[in-house]
Amino acid sequence: QLRHGHLGRRLETFVEPQFVHKERTVRPDGLVRVRRGSRVWTALVEVKMSTAPLTAEQVELYVELARAEGFDAVITISNQLLSGGDDIPVDIDRRKLRKVALRHLSWDEIRSVAIHLSMHDKVEDATQRWVLREFVRYLLHDQSKLQGFADMGPDWVHVRDGVKNRTL
């Protein structure tokens, strides 16, 4: 568990929290809780490394769990690139997203932000700055398998063609 207070907010993170949902044990990769005054925002987190894909079954299960627990969101992280900010990486019943938000971050996006923060000294605390730089080193290391992508996926074909044809 990590706690970090900033501007009246309190951030708590949990690794592999365990829940019982529909008579089975469910263990997402993480849980993030942000408190500000009496307001609380909570999200389940599912992370995939390398080329491991997110599955609709798993993401839908976490959306159902988040709804049952009264959580606000499910955050997925993978190497999958999406064509827009509101796109989701799997095909699930969108009606289940009425009360629970589903947000996706790619490792490329996370790496870009981490490098930017690290290069421009956006982190004041020396220990946190060191941890961030080590995280960037990990993200860039060949063994992490998070240092880029080989295929932008089918959603990007229209963008490529639009640039090529000058129709964007």
Regions found by a protein language model. Give the residues of each.
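Charged, terminal alpha-helix-loop-beta segments
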Residues: 1-168
